[in-house]
Amino acid sequence: MQLLYDLTKMNYSALYGEGRYLRIPAPIHYADKFVKALGKNWKIDEELLKHGFLYFI
């Protein structure tokens, strides 16, 4: 999780070059949101995470 968060600090949400456009996959964006929520002392229901819910969006 920390690695994904560190990747978001690179600020490469979109890359441009020579007529090409590349977007970073959404999981990195959502990992950033998740880590920030944990930093705000959110209480995380582990059962919801087991089922794949992304309730921190």
From Swiss-Prot:
The keyword Signal does not apply. Coiled coil: none annotated. It comes from the Archaea. Signal peptide: none annotated. Keywords: Toxin-antitoxin system. Pfam families: Piwi (PF02171). One of its GO terms (molecular function) is nucleic acid binding. The keyword NADP does not apply. InterPro entries: Piwi (IPR003165), RNaseH-like_sf (IPR012337), RNaseH_sf (IPR036397). Possibly the antitoxin component of a type II toxin-antitoxin (TA) system. Its cognate toxin is VapC4 (Potential). This is Putative antitoxin VapB4. It comes from Methanocaldococcus jannaschii (strain ATCC 43067 / DSM 2661 / JAL-1 / JCM 10045 / NBRC 100440). The lineage of its organism: Archaea, Methanobacteriati, Methanobacteriota, Methanomada group, Methanococci. The gene is vapB4.
